Amino acid sequence: EADLALGKAVFDGNCAACHAGGGNNVIPDHTLQKAAIEQFLDGGFNIEAIVYQIENGKGAMPAWDGRLDEDEIAGVAAYVYDQAAGNKW
């Protein structure tokens, strides 16, 4: 099971520069809100699609595969999913 505490730490240290508070400082409409993830993420709103995006990047977002390990990617994906699913952003 993914570690949400690890995911939050990874998010805060690596993702928050562009995605603080679930937003997007580069492309404002492409937030980490559930509706935006459903609309813009290849594969829709699910853990696998979030993992794919983190690993491979897209557009202005860099690929994190090789920069974060498997547990870190799983954790941050679970954290993003949990925050968005619960409208916690």
From Swiss-Prot:
Subcellular locations according to the entry: Plastid, Chloroplast thylakoid lumen
One MF term in the entry's GO annotations: heme binding
GO BP annotations, alphabetical order: photosynthesis
Chief location of this protein within or outside the cell: plastid
Gene3D superfamilies documented for this protein: Cytochrome c-like domain (1.10.760.10)
Binding site for heme c: 15, 18-19, 61
Domain of life of the source: Eukaryota
Keyword terms of this UniProt record: Chloroplast, Electron transport, Heme, Iron, Metal-binding, Photosynthesis, Plastid, Thylakoid, Transport
PTMs per UniProt: Binds 1 heme c group covalently per subunit.
GO CC annotation, single: chloroplast thylakoid lumen
Pfam family, one: Cytochrome_CBB3
UniProt family annotation: Belongs to the cytochrome c family. PetJ subfamily.
Function summary: Functions as an electron carrier between membrane-bound cytochrome b6-f and photosystem I in oxygenic photosynthesis.
Oligomer and partners: Monomer.
Protein name stated in the entry: Cytochrome c6
Lineage, opening ranks: Eukaryota, Viridiplantae, Chlorophyta, core chlorophytes, Chlorophyceae
Gene name per UniProt: petJ
